[in-house]
């Protein structure tokens, strides 16, 4: 009896040790993931502190035939394509300090067409859902006011905020609810991520800035980070003054 009791205790101890080892292994994996994410955040933070310029190849149909969220005149000679994340504090800082001036001095004056695309980062767990909600608002002509609400409440991102914001914007709630579950809308967000990644984008906010000709964005400049209005204005004014010429000509 004593031997069976001893064996049972040993078996239980071995099971508990095995479970503990498994938990430790899982914790190590999670710590490795967190470590990688922290490194990414650090790199993005550094990127956002200094202007980075890179010239890309000409982008065809950069505005999705007008189907993407946009502001400004369709005939504007310059364009900015934004890649943003609704949980990104640097994106919020850009909107608060730079975007409003760009809108007043370039977009509203017909000089620049502004296109918004999504680039939710993997470690921002609510960012992709927020991007879907914004795109669903776009279907009902309320993208920009929804975008403003999402950025102003980035700590409360989630279904409750999306629903209350949609109600405040007087959206068709049935249509909005169906859209939130539409795989095609999520696929559009994923396509933006794939497209941005193909351009070398890895952090937010990031921007393509270039001249427009025949529906193409000619050799755009890739600008990374929450840069000042002065940085954007310098790039735009330089492009406006330069003759139209593609790389290699």
Give the positions of each predicted feature.
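Structural alpha/beta surface segment adjacent to cysteine/selenocysteine redox centers
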Residues: 76, 81-167, 238-239, 246-247
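Short clusters of hydrophobic/aromatic residues that line enzyme substrate/ligand-binding pockets
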Residues: 69-71, 157, 223
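Short gly/ser/thr-rich secondary-structure transition/capping motifs
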Residues: 60-66, 187-190
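A short beta-strand-turn-helix
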Residues: 62-78, 106
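A generic local structural motif
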Residues: 65-68, 100-101, 193-194
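C-terminal cap of thioredoxin/glutaredoxin-like
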Residues: 2-35, 164-249
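N-proximal helix/coil linker or "cap" segments that precede and/or mark the start of modular domains
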Residues: 33-60
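Conserved strand-loop elements at the edges of beta-sheets that form or border functional pockets
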Residues: 73, 82, 225
């Amino acid at each position: 009896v004593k031997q069976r009791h001893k064996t049972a205790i040993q078996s239980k101890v071995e099971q508990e040790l095995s479970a503990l080892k498994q938990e430790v292994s899982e914790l190590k994996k999670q710590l490795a993931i967190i470590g990688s994410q922290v490194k990414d955040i650090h790199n993005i933070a550094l990127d956002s502190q200094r202007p980075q310029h890179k010239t890309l190849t000409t982008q065809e149909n950069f505005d999705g035939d007008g189907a993407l969220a946009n502001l400004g005149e369709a005939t504007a000679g310059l364009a900015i394509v934004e890649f943003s994340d609704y949980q990104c504090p640097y994106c919020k800082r850009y909107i608060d300090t730079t975007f409003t001036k760009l809108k007043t001095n370039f977009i509203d004056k017909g000089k620049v067409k502004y296109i918004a695309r999504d680039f939710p980062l993997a470690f921002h767990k609510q960012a992709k859902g927020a991007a879907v909600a914004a795109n669903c608002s776009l279907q009902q002509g309320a993208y920009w006011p929804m975008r403003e609400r999402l950025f102003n409440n980035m700590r409360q991102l989630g279904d409750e905020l999306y629903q209350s914001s949609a109600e405040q914007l007087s959206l068709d709630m049935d249509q909005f609810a169906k859209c939130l579950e539409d795989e095609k809308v999520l696929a559009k967000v994923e396509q933006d991520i794939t497209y941005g990644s193909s351009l070398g984008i890895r952090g937010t906010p990031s921007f393509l800035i270039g001249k427009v000709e025949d529906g193409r964005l000619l050799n755009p400049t890739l600008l990374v980070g929450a840069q000042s209005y002065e940085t954007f204005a310098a790039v735009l004014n330089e492009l406006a003054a330069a003759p139209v010429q593609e790389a290699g000509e």
